Amino acid sequence: MFNVDTPALITFILLIVVGALGGALVGYFIRVAQHEKSLRLAREEAERIIEDGKKEADRTKREMVFEAKQEILTLRKEFDEDIKDRRQIVMNLEEKATQRENALNQRSQYLDKREIGLDAKEERHNERKEQLDIQYSKVEELIKEQEEKLSSISALSREQARELIMAQVRDSISNEIAAYIRDEEDNAKSIAQNKSKEILSLAMQKYAAETTSERTVTVVEIPNEDMKGRIIGKEGRNIRSLEALTGVDLIIDDTPEAVVLSGFDPVRREVAKRALTILVQDGRIHPGRIEEVVERARTEIDMFIREAGEEAVFKTGVGKVHPDIIKLLGRMTFRTSYGQNVLKHSIEVAFLAGKLAAEIGENEMLARRAGLFHDIGKAIDHEVEGSHVSIGVELMSRYKEPKEVIDAIASHHGDSEPESIIAVLVAAADALSAARPGARSESMDSYMKRLTQLEEISNDVTGVDKAYAIQAGREVRVMVLPDKVDDLGLINIARTIKEKIEAQMTYPGTIKVTVIREKRATDVAK
């Protein structure tokens, strides 16, 4: 059909075949080159991944080594601190053991001395008894001789003669009896005084108050005189609002840069003081702000009262205490007696009573508890009728306190006789705290009244010539009439004055009564 040149066709076919083969070869080589490139890239990627893995492993290794070193350092530090604490504990235990050993040695030495003293005293008593027996025998012999003599030479009956002889014998040995009584009384007083001094000195060495208790401050300082006008407010509305909310009178007078707060309740006075201080510092003073600040101050005071009571309970270690009693203790931080802070005084009495109890083998914790609560009635004595003693007894009875605590409260001012050793110790600790120099201040009027009363009591006793109160009322020196009072009467006068002072006066500590009998003979040489 078609006229095709055979050689040309063959040539064309060969060209096509050759081209196809060439294209296939070119494609093959291109594919091989691409494959090699892919392998090379994959190899490079693998090498990069391996290198990154090595770097990450190396970094992780370094971090783990660092953390391990830090943990080792921390453990070593904790171990060193633990060793240090254990060493300190061991040192403290050794120190306590040494102190305990020293105390036991001192106690042993004291007991040895006391035993020697008791043996000597017993020996003296035996000697005195033998002397008295001898004197008694002599007196009996003398009486018999006198009876026989009088019966033979007198018409007196036996009974009349005996009465006459006994009167003579009484007169002859009265001086000896008085001397014996005086010696024994002085000896007993000396032993009791030395023992009491030792116990009290040990107790006071183990506890001493840090500072003299402060007075309650009722003066608020203000920056300038203009602030007084702002406190008063327009038509006095600010000061009226503050007085109505706090129950305290504000006295704004000519005192420079100061406002005086006057109120019977110390807690209210402290609330007013804090509120006024905040208002003065803030500068915004108006009825709304005053109400807000007073409420804030009242909340702060309530919190402070609770914390103060809890701190007192914790410090004295008296055990579990009812929350209401804790609050009453906290209120006493704003109460003062003769300038002495009542809460600090109660803490001081608690420690002193505890130390005294420990020295004589009584319950130390119970003594501290009684000492801490002994003035609890002063927390509300301005709100409730009655003395702080009766209020305290009622409160402690209501909260089921131990009978020793109630007894200590009832008797620490001598209103009733103490029924337990704890009550006696609390009264002694109370007197120690009150009599400590600087603990209390006393007005001049009451001081002079006490000295005058002391001299009047002494002068009222029969046979007294003059009496002088000396040593700030700690001693009364009495001069007696020598013609009316003999040596035996000195003891009776001293005892009478002592009993009257104890019955009629209230005083801290003790009062020494010294009675002096002096007889003078004078003449004039011409």
From Swiss-Prot:
**Transmembrane parts of this sequence:** 10-30
Disulfide links within the chain: none
Q: Which domain of life is it from?
A: Bacteria
Q: Name one GO cellular component term.
A: plasma membrane
Please state every residue range assigned to the domain named KH: 216-279
Q: HAMAP family, alphabetically? A: RNase_Y
Described purpose of this protein according to its UniProt entry? Endoribonuclease that initiates mRNA decay.
This chain belongs to the protein called Ribonuclease Y
User: What is the organism of origin for this protein?
Assistant: Acholeplasma laidlawii (strain PG-8A)
